[in-house]
Regions:
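Phosphate-binding glycine-rich loop
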Residues: 1-13
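Generic structural signal for small/hydrophobic residues in well-ordered secondary structure
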Residues: 14-15, 28, 63, 70, ...
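Aromatic/hydrophobic pocket-lining residues that form π-stacking "cages" and hydrophobic walls in ligand
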Residues: 24, 84, 114-118
Length: 191
């Protein structure tokens, strides 16, 4: 919502993987955007970005990515990120990378996130925002504690948005969050 222009003459497009986490669609609709789905395809069940018509890409403001994905479990590789970055270079959209499941993997190989992929490919973090939380990492979905990182200008707008639309984190939640972020053993055991 913070990145969409609700008074634009044309509805901004937001591209979402399908299936998807419902908040992507809800935030798009609340921001007066048009949701367009990139269906996942076998065998890897990654979003098929090429199925999105060029006319939609030209109006695209945000692409939601979830890796590891909920609910498919699919994981983007550096090459997959590179392909998405090529589309971003062509159309100028923001990548909103949901990495709440990044700590849940089974083969000992930590998935590469959006910011890491950008850095390894020699890119800046322009028009990239990544978010994660303790919900999945630490099995505390009600705690509502996480963070965002990425493009400084996007983060400034996000901070302004959160200041007026968010809620403050209580001191007990802050202490519990610090303890959870500082403990890796429970994450390893959960994995």
């Amino acid at each position: 919502q913070a990145a969409l222009d609700p008074v634009a003459s044309e509805k901004p497009v937001v591209v979402s993987p399908n299936p998807f986490y419902q908040i992507y669609e809800g935030a798009t609709l609340l921001g007066n955007g048009e949701i367009v789905y990139a269906n996942t395809t076998a065998p890897r069940f990654l979003p098929d970005w090429h199925s999105v018509p060029a006319e939609k890409w030209t109006r695209c403001k945000i692409v939601f990515v979830c890796s590891p994905d909920n609910p498919t479990g699919s994981v983007l590789t550096r090459d997959d990120w590179a392909q998405l970055f090529e589309l971003q270079d062509k159309y100028g959209f923001i990548i909103a990378s949901d990495e709440c499941y990044a700590e849940i993997y089974f083969d000992g190989q930590k998935p590469i996130g959006c910011l890491q992929a950008a850095a390894e490919l020699g890119r800046t973090f322009d028009n990239i925002i990544m978010f994660t939380s303790l919900s999945k990492r630490s099995n505390v979905p009600g705690l509502r504690s996480g963070f965002v990182a990425g493009d400084v200008e996007l983060l400034k707008n996000f901070l302004l948005y959160r200041t007026y639309h968010g809620s403050a984190m209580g001191i007990p939640v802050q202490h519990a969050s610090i303890a959870a972020w500082n403990d890796e053993q429970h994450v390893i055991e959960n994995r």
